Curated annotation (Swiss-Prot):
Annotated catalysed reactions: 3-phosphoshikimate + phosphoenolpyruvate = 5-O-(1-carboxyvinyl)-3-phosphoshikimate + phosphate
GO CC entries: cytoplasm
E.C. number: 2.5.1.19
Oligomer and partners: Monomer.
Designated name of the protein: 3-phosphoshikimate 1-carboxyvinyltransferase
Similarity comment text for this entry: Belongs to the EPSP synthase family.
Compartment(s) where it occurs, according to its Swiss-Prot or TrEMBL record: Cytoplasm
Keyword Transferase on entry: yes
Active-site positions on this chain: 328
Record field: transmembrane: none
Source lineage: Bacteria, Bacillati, Cyanobacteriota, Cyanophyceae, Synechococcales
One Gene Ontology term of the molecular function aspect: 3-phosphoshikimate 1-carboxyvinyltransferase activity
Organism expressing this protein natively: Prochlorococcus marinus (strain MIT 9313)
Length: 441
């Protein structure tokens, strides 16, 4: 495929050809957010190597700077320096905190700022973020004594936060969401008494790993690590953080490499945290030819290189506890399902309806336009693969993961496609289009 930018908001995608080479995906988005945030509330200096220099982490950095944290320039390939202000050092900003398009930023900030007694904050973001539900964070925080006001009884930004001294206790999260869990863990750091957070299913655990590294008194227990207990009173201290490559970004190359005729790719330095490797388990279920090479550990996170070769894929069925471990990879798995002979089914994935877009609806709409055979359900998709996809006019509908998933679909289609909203990829993978152009043969 060749990629031709026809305007700032669209590109021409030409199908055909092979895919080979080595690629290093950007730093993990989830870890990048947390490294910035935990560094800002620690004492001393935190250095971050490999931080994702994309729009979402930039939103987190901007909010923290507005409250008094000193964060150095964020550029590709440069170590970022964060001078922490301590657990209670963040100050009232002079303006609304703009979280951009980042659900992680606004939800983690809610947990942190709700516990800043005597200070007041207003959090907002772009039009997409203002449509995303926030009560999943606000309601459990309210049980701890938080005061959060917003549209639709606090479910939609802008949100006004009046900082309080929060109470510890046993708090259940309404959904298996690392964002919700992390917000509660941040609130628990300065609560009155210990807090135990209980999830309905195990979500990604980057916050638990990193908070312990920074010095928090945090214990993980219960079935599959679903009970997390935080005892307040411990200071956090600056750390040297190395951010591995984002497996959610690697997923696009894994699927493309598994499907493009003759393809062989190596994706280097990918984070292999077991709460994030659901995509590898499903691809193995599909009999994709994937090897994990050079396994090692960096800053408490398992890392490795992934080699993928093209081969025939079998249909798959996913549901239940694996969904939180691959929730961001469902769009690219929907593309993969279109090229399997047989029926694939995704259920228990209603969480995708409240992402940057309604990803179930958007992927159904866009892939159907290419000729895919898809039934959309309340909580998932049924996809009958084996039909030839045709190049056509496509639209990311402002969603970064949709944009990159459709690029892979276009690579495998018959005929060219035009993608509107290609710039959305910059939210998590600023160099995606450059890497695609380089790897195409």
């Amino acid at each position: 495929m060749s990629v031709t930018n026809t305007a700032s908001s669209s590109c021409e995608l030409r199908a055909g050809g092979g895919l080979s080479g080595t690629v290093r995906v950007p730093g993990d988005k989830s870890i990048s957010h947390r490294a910035l945030l935990f560094g800002a509330i620690a004492e001393g200096v935190t250095t971050i190597e490999g931080l994702l220099p994309a729009e979402d982490p930039m939103s987190t950095a901007a909010c923290l700077r507005a409250m008094g944290a000193t964060i150095g320039p964020i550029h590709v390939g440069q170590i970022v320096r964060v001078e922490g202000v301590g657990l209670d050092g963040l100050q009232e900003p002079q303006d609304v905190l703009d979280c951009g398009n980042s659900g992680t930023t606004i939800r983690l900030m809610l947990g942190l700022l709700a516990a800043r007694k005597g200070r007041h904050f207003v959090l907002s973001g772009d039009a997409s973020l203002r449509r995303r539900p926030m009560n999943r964070v606000g309601q459990p925080l309210t049980m701890m004594g938080a005061k959060i006001k917003g549209r639709s009884n606090g479910d939609f930004a802008p949100l006004a936060v009046s900082g309080q001294k929060l109470r510890g206790g046993v708090i259940g999260t309404p959904v298996a969401s690392a964002q919700v869990k992390s917000a509660l863990l941040l609130a628990a750091l300065t609560a009155d008494g210990a807090t135990t957070v209980i999830e309905p299913a195990h979500s990604r655990d980057h916050s638990e790993r990193m908070l312990r590294a920074f010095g928090a008194d945090l214990e993980v227990g219960g079935e599959m690590g679903r009970h997390i207990r935080v005892s307040p009173g411990q200071k956090l201290y600056g750390q040297n953080i190395v951010v591995p490559g984002d497996i959610s970004s690697a997923a696009f190359w894994l699927v493309a490499g598994a499907l493009v005729p003759g393809a062989e790719l190596v994706v280097e330095n990918v984070g292999l945290n077991p709460t994030r490797t659901g995509i590898l388990e499903v691809l193995q279920q599909m009999e994709a030819r994937i090897e994990v090479l050079n396994r090692h550990e960096v800053a408490g996170e398992p890392v490795g290189d992934l080699r993928v070769r093209q081969g025939s894929l079998k249909p798959f069925s996913i549901n239940g506890d694996i969904i939180p471990r691959l929730v961001d990879e469902v769009p690219i798995l929907a593309v993969a399902a279109c090229f399997c002979d047989g029926e694939s089914k995704i259920t228990d994935a209603s969480e995708l309806r409240v992402k940057e877009t309604d990803r179930l609806a958007v992927m159904t709409r866009q892939l159907t336009a290419m000729g895919a055979d898809i039934d959309e359900h309340a909580d998932g998709l049924t996809i009958r693969g084996g039909r030839t996809l045709r190049g056509t006019d496509l639209d990311s509908e402002t969603d970064h993961r949709v944009a990159m998933s459709l690029a892979v679909a276009a690579l495998l289609a018959e005929g060219n496609s035009r993608l509107t909203g290609s710039e959305a990829a910059a939210v998590s993978y600023p160099n995606f289009w450059d890497d695609l152009e380089r790897l195409h043969r």
